[in-house]
Amino acid sequence: MAVHVVDHPLVRHKLGILREDGISTSRFRALAQEISRLLTYEATKDLATEAKTITGWAGEVEVEEIKGKKITVVPILRAGLGMMDGVLDMVPGARVSVVGFYRDEETLQPVEYYVKLASNIDERIALILDPMLATGGTLMATIDLLKKSGCTNIKGLFLVAAPEGIEKIVKAHPDVDIYTASIDEKLNDAGYILPGLGDAGDKIFGTK
């Protein structure tokens, strides 16, 4: 497993705007999608390609096309949907798998309430989408679910991540790569990332 911080001037600039208190819903959505495109660029660097000959304007030309495993994007409801369009802009042929969890108030553990996975999930590369990797509990449950379904090539894409969540995933799933725009300072007592983004779901959907 590797943790990849996508350290780029455009990413840092856009993330800085995302952190602003009072940012509009439309602006937050747009920036979340823009950063998601850049995360996808990094997360797909290792896709296999093969040569192909096509007819260009001046005759035949050899080009490359992506081959091998197909991709499924896996937004975690609901906030992960805010990253989905940006990722699909980069990999428009990807299938969409959706998972949803709620937290049990007694055990504080994630409980699955919705799952719809792409066909042939065992033959696909899964890109899990969630704006924030905080405690790692929901991500852990998502990875477990995908692996039980036969998926072995899994990556997670996050706008920001907390060290605590990263450590948890590294220990439990060393074969899963994490891509994030920032590793933030820590979690507060309520489990929010500091400095973080606040409630990304509310900011994406305009709710409170």
Swiss-Prot record:
Residues that bind 5-phospho-alpha-D-ribose 1-diphosphate: R78, R103, D130, P131, M132, L133, A134, T135, G136, G137, T138, D199
Binding positions for uracil per the UniProt entry: I193, G198, D199, A200
One annotated GO biological process: UMP salvage
Pathway: Pyrimidine metabolism; UMP biosynthesis via salvage pathway; UMP from uracil: step 1/1
Manner of cofactor binding, per the entry note: Binds 1 Mg(2+) ion per subunit. The magnesium is bound as Mg-PRPP.
Enzymatic reactions: UMP + diphosphate = 5-phospho-alpha-D-ribose 1-diphosphate + uracil
EC number per UniProt: 2.4.2.9
Family: Belongs to the UPRTase family.
Official protein name in the record: Uracil phosphoribosyltransferase
Organism field: Maridesulfovibrio salexigens (strain ATCC 14822 / DSM 2638 / NCIMB 8403 / VKM B-1763)
Gene name of the record: upp
